Amino acid sequence: MTTLYEGAFAKLNLTLDVLGKREDGYHDLQSVMQTISVRDDIEIDIGTGKPWCLKCDKEGIPCDERNLAWKAAKVYCDAMKKDPDGIEIRITKRIPSEAGMGGGSADAAAVLRALNRHYGEPLSIGALAELGAQVGSDVPFCVVCGTAMVEGRGEKLRKLPDMPDCIFVICKPEFSVSTPELYKKIDECTIGKRPDNRAMESALLAGDLEKVCQNVYNVFDPVVTADHAELNYIKSLLHQYGAAAYQMTGSGSAVYCIVENFEYAAVICSMLRENYPQVFIAKPI
């Protein structure tokens, strides 16, 4: 038996635009996405000689084929015609669930990377990302990591320059958001403001953190805020403490802000933790 270890890194959406619904039921998106240092830890036992098994240290996480990490292992082994003679996947969760931070997708991507490394890396990172699209829309980006423009339903990736040095503070309120319901609301409403992805890309190319902050925007944010005024309260706290930018990530419900240094982030984190238990400090990676 062999044990594999891999980190599963969360993501944030610096921008997120919904361009329209496709014939296959998915939506075309355009988003600048960023990997951050908040991570789950994945351990995989290969060759257990037993039925497949998944364990997680957090309650409420499915521990069967519904879990994207399990699905990723199945997709990889089927595609590469590998018989591992039993797999046990163990997930130590730190990425909050139902936050818009890609926790399940990050776990799936980590499984794909670990299995590919175990079998001698027969697939390039690009090919592995393509395989990840069979598992979930955010999985291709979570395979590649870094900073990227993500399009289509998540399968089209273009690497961008690294995020300028900064610190993220992320706050996850208690409520969660139904992603299917959110897309339904987006389909039924007229999107007013949209992110300027070209401006965001130019800011990254210039390494200009101030302009990056000026162009952070997520079309889902006002839709979710209309139903959950608590998001405005969190953002008012961030504004009060002078955060350079603040925005919901993905389909929510986590809100992040961008600051220039760890000391500033620690002050904001301490303030938020007076009301919210799930607050994280992270770096772009």
Residue spans for each PLM region:
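Glycine/serine-rich anion-binding loops at beta->alpha junctions
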Residues: 90-119, 137, 244-259
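Short, basic/glycine-rich phosphate-binding loops at helix/coil junctions
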Residues: 49-62, 111, 206-217
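Conserved, helical-rich catalytic subdomain that frames metal- and/or nucleotide-binding sites
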Residues: 144, 149-245, 260-270, 277, ...
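Solvent-exposed alpha-helices and their adjacent loops that cap or buttress functional pockets
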Residues: 35, 133-134, 140-143, 159-164, ...
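Short, conserved aromatic-histidine micro-motifs
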Residues: 59, 126-142, 268-284
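Contiguous, small/hydrophobic- and glycine-enriched helical/loop subdomains that border
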Residues: 108, 112-149
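Residue-level signal for inorganic ion chemistry
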Residues: 14, 42-44, 69, 104, ...
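ATP-binding N-lobe of GHMP and related small-molecule kinases
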Residues: 1-99, 117, 121-126, 163, ...
